[in-house]
From Swiss-Prot:
<dbReference type="GO" id="GO:0005829">
    <property type="term" value="C:cytosol"/>
</dbReference>
<dbReference type="InterPro" id="IPR011978">
    <property type="entry name" value="YgfB-like"/>
</dbReference>
<comment type="similarity">
    <text>Belongs to the UPF0149 family.</text>
</comment>
<protein>
    <recommendedName>
        <fullName>UPF0149 protein VSAL_I2539</fullName>
    </recommendedName>
</protein>
<dbReference type="Pfam" id="PF03695">
    <property type="entry name" value="UPF0149"/>
</dbReference>
<dbReference type="InterPro" id="IPR036255">
    <property type="entry name" value="YgfB-like_sf"/>
</dbReference>
Length: 189
C-alpha cells in the first residue's frame, strides 16, 4: 500500500481557490482535525456533508476540491490514529513570514474549535484537562503579532505557542477521537 502524504499548502490553496471555495488550507485542516478529534467517524465520507454545510451553504464541492479535501482528511486520520500520534498543521511555512504564519495559525485554531462544535462536543462530560486545553485554544485564537516588537522574540514566542497548540489538540483528540486505525502508520511526515 502506498504512503499517505499531506498535500502542500500552496497546492491545497490553489485547488480551493480554483473551485471557488472561500476557505483557506488552514481553515480546512483545522475543521477536519477538530471534527476528527471530536469523534467524527473515520471513513472518507463522514466529513463531507459537514464541510459542505460549513463552507459552501450545503452545496457539494467540485471534484478537484473533494480530491484535495480527501487527501488532507486521509493524511490527518493516519497521523492522529497512528502509533506515533503526530500532528502536522497545514499553515503557511517559514518562508511566508511570521505575520502570515500567525494568521494561518489563528485561522487553524478557530476552525479546529468550530470543527469540534460541528460534531456536537459535549462539554458537560469533558475532563478538566480537555476543558483547560479548549480554554487555552480559545485564547490562542485571539492572539496576534505586534509588528513593533522584536521580530526574533515574536518568532520564538510563536514557536512556543505552536507547540502548545499541538499539545492542546492532542489532549483533546486522545479524550474524544477515534482510536487506532489499522493502516494509520502509513503517513509520511
Amino acid at each position: 500500500m502506498s504512503e499517505i502524504k499531506m498535500p502542500e499548502f500552496l497546492t491545497v490553496e490553489s485547488a480551493l481557490k480554483d473551485s471557488g471555495l472561500a476557505v483557506t488550507p488552514a481553515e480546512l485542516h483545522g475543521l477536519l482535525v477538530g471534527m476528527i478529534s471530536g469523534g467524527l467517524p473515520l471513513d472518507d465520507n463522514a466529513w463531507k456533508p459537514l464541510m459542505y454545510d460549513y463552507t459552501n451553504d450545503g452545496l457539494g464541492w467540485p471534484d478537484s476540491a473533494i480530491q484535495i479535501g480527501s487527501a488532507v482528511f486521509q493524511f490527518t486520520v493516519a497521523e492522529l490514529t497512528g502509533s506515533e500520534l503526530a500532528l502536522s498543521m497545514l499553515i503557511p511555512n517559514d518562508k511566508e513570514g511570521l505575520m502570515n504564519r500567525a494568521d494561518g495559525l489563528s485561522e487553524w485554531v478557530n476552525h479546529f474549535i468550530s470543527g469540534l462544535g460541528l460534531v456536537d462536543l459535549k462539554m458537560d462530560k469533558a475532563s478538566e484537562a480537555l476543558k483547560e486545553a479548549l480554554v487555552d485554544l480559545e485564547e490562542i485564537a485571539r492572539l496576534g503579532i505586534d509588528e513593533d516588537d522584536d521580530i526574533e522574540e515574536q518568532e520564538s514566542l510563536f514557536e512556543q505557542v505552536l507547540e502548545h497548540v499541538h499539545v492542546c489538540v492532542l489532549t483533546i483528540h486522545l479524550e474524544l477521537g477515534q482510536r487506532i486505525h489499522k493502516d494509520a502508520s502509513k503517513a509520511v511526515h
